[in-house]
């Protein structure tokens, strides 16, 4: 079974559904919630629903 929340590291995110999102160089996560993350470059990453 897939984890119920995202796994976040310095260089990327593994979403609850198993999708790997590589962060661009110099970009970090400034806010993380149960269904999405806001990045320091203004991008918004939405996780797929499980």
Curated annotation (Swiss-Prot):
Residue ranges of Sequence repeats: 6-23, 30-47
Coiled-coil regions listed: none
Tissue localization of expression: Calcified shell.
Pfam short name (any one): Cuticle_1
Disulfide cross-links: none
Keywords of this entry: Cuticle, Repeat
InterPro entries registered for this protein in UniProt: Cuticle_1
Record bears the keyword Zinc-finger: no
Superkingdom of source: Eukaryota
Keyword Repeat in annotation: yes
GO molecular function, one term: structural constituent of cuticle
The protein, known as: Cuticle protein CP498
Organism of derivation: Cancer pagurus
Organism phylogeny: Eukaryota, Metazoa, Ecdysozoa, Arthropoda, Crustacea
């Amino acid at each position: 079974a897939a984890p119920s929340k995202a796994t976040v590291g310095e260089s990327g995110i593994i979403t609850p559904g198993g999708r790997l999102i590589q962060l661009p160089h110099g970009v970090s996560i400034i806010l993380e919630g149960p269904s999405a993350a806001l990045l320091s470059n203004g991008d918004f990453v939405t996780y797929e629903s499980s």
